[in-house]
Amino acid sequence: MRTSKKRGRESKALGVGPAAAVHVLKSGMPRALGVRPISITRKRVVAEMRVKPIHINRSGRVNGGALMAFADVMGAAGTVANLPAGYRTGTLESKTNFFRAGERPVMRAVSIPLHIGRTTMVWQTTIRNPDGQIAAIVTQTQIVIPAKS
C-alpha cells in the first residue's frame, strides 16, 4: 500500500479487490473483535469471530452490538473486494434480525451481495453459532464514493 503526504499528514492509498478486503478484516476494529478471514471473493466473504470476554453481556451470551459490528466489517470487506480503483466505502444503513443468542467459542459469518451497483452495494450477512444455528441476519447498504471526498 503506498502512502502520500496530504495537508501535513500521511494518508494511505486505498487498495481494492479481494486482497485489500483481507486487509480490512485483519486491521483496526476487526482485529479488536477477533475476526479471522476464512475466504474472500467478490461474491462471498467468510470469516470467524472468536468470542472474547468483552463480547459477553450480563446473561453470558454474545452482545448484540458485537454481532452487528462483526456483520458491519464483513459487508465492508465484501464491498472493498468489489470497489473500482480510487473509491472507498462506508456503511449507509444496517438492519439486524436476531434469531437467538450468540454462543461461544467461535461464531461464523457469511456475507453475500444482494446488489453491486455503481454508487451503493447491499450485503447480507448470516452469523451462525458453533452448532450451525442462525444467530442473526444483517442487511447493510454500503456507499461507494471517490477516495478523495
Name the predicted role of every residue range.
Residues 1-149:
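Terminal targeting signals and extreme-terminal segments of soluble enzymes
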